[in-house]
Amino acid sequence: MLLTSCGTGPNDPDASETAGASAAPSGTAASGPDSSATASATGPSPTAEDAPLDGLVIAVDPGHNGGNSGDPAAINAEVPDGRGGTKACNTVGTQTDDGYPEHRFNWETAQALQEALEEAGAEVVLSRNSDDGVGPCVDERGGFADDADALVSLHANGTEDRSAHGFHVVAAPAGEHADEETAEASEQLASALVDALEDEDFAPNPAYDSPVVRSDLSTLNHASVPAVLLEAGEMRNADDAALLESSDGQERIADAIVDALVEVLDP
């Protein structure tokens, strides 16, 4: 199987897209606070402190997909890159040295994030509804969030150097789909996420700015709302891999994302 590194080096802004999928989207999955209405009706009404994201819609994009490797024609199809050009629909993603795939990390962390967001009062929409499909493509992963209040795209990096470690967060500059105000909000959200992850004892990757601003990631380029892409760690680094594979690590990442969203979006 050909594996493509999810991320790129800090000095390689024109490398392949990290966020990804397929030319044949499997649709989006929506989930929100209505699913728990029966249970909550028997207890006290949530306060603003209990549900700081009440009334907001958060789009979550678990990068790649488990079926991408089985459909190279789909994931290699050219799609708009959001900057006037085209690029491949997606890549397969990376994996740890013991074979834990990035797409599974992204999916499992998305599940933890969905739960944490709903506990904070948000409605959650997902760019894919399983981890065994193909797609959607990177342009659709950004565009599906048009009716949301923010987009978080989940990834993990695949630098070949096993000594590379730590997370980095990416925002995009203003462009075809996001004006200057939205781009500024994206960078603000990215900065808040850096701080929140550090508060959860995650170490930033010293090779990258905190946050990174890049114009070559099509998922971010197609977002019309504040959007960030998280590379949560280096999957080929043994310590990072152990953390990313653990439910504790995934839940702490989810908690940090919620904290960042609350800081920036708390209505």
Describe these PLM feature segments.
Residues 13-16, 36, 70-73, 92, ...:
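Intrinsic disorder/low-complexity detector
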Residues 7, 100-267:
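Active-site-proximal helix/loop segments of hydrolytic enzymes
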Residues 16, 28, 36, 49, ...:
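A generic alpha-helix propensity feature with a strong bias for hydrophobic helices
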Residues 16-18, 38, 65, 94, ...:
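A generic signature of intrinsically disordered, low-complexity regions enriched in glycine/proline
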Residues 6-57:
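N-terminal low-complexity, Pro/Thr-rich disordered segments
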Residues 1-4:
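Sec-dependent bacterial lipoprotein signal peptides
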Residues 46-141:
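Active-site histidine-acidic residue metal-binding/catalytic motifs
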